[in-house]
């Protein structure tokens, strides 16, 4: 993970950043329940992940607390196809604090399958532990 690029990037309702622990973070901020993540925004998010990971294997922690809305079918297909072909995302940890978002993530993962392991958490600290454990497993 030596090539891991530090920095942050913001696109619309999403901010991506890295920390010294090697985790790539994403915080989505959307308070509009009728807003859908579209194909263009999903493309920008994927570009941010590629740039900040510097094509090195990293865990992705996605903070969806207090987020509303959903995603378009086109965006969902793009994300699932891209994650299936993205060898540098080793796992996804979702942090949620509402039943509706938890169900949305579970439905997305069931319908748009990827090979990347994922887990849902209520706290950032639990998600970080999961990410670090998955990283350690790969280094063994």
What is the role of each PLM region?
Residues 1-140:
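Amphipathic, Lys/Arg-enriched alpha-helical "gate/interface" segment within cytosolic domains
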């Amino acid at each position: 993970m030596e090539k891991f690029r530090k920095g942050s990037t913001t696109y619309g309702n999403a901010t991506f950043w890295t920390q010294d622990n090697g985790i790539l973070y994403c915080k989505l901020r959307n308070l509009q329940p009728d807003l859908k993540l579209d194909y263009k925004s999903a493309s920008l998010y994927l570009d941010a992940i590629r740039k900040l990971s510097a094509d090195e294997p990293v865990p992705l922690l996605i903070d969806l607390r207090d987020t509303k809305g959903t995603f378009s079918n086109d965006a969902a297909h793009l994300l699932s196809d891209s994650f299936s072909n993205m060898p540098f995302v080793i796992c996804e940890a979702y942090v949620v604090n509402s039943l509706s978002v938890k169900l949305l993530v579970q439905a997305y993962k069931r319908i748009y399958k990827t090979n990347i392991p994922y887990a849902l958490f209520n706290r950032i600290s639990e998600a970080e532990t999961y990410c670090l454990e998955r990283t350690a497993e790969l280094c063994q």
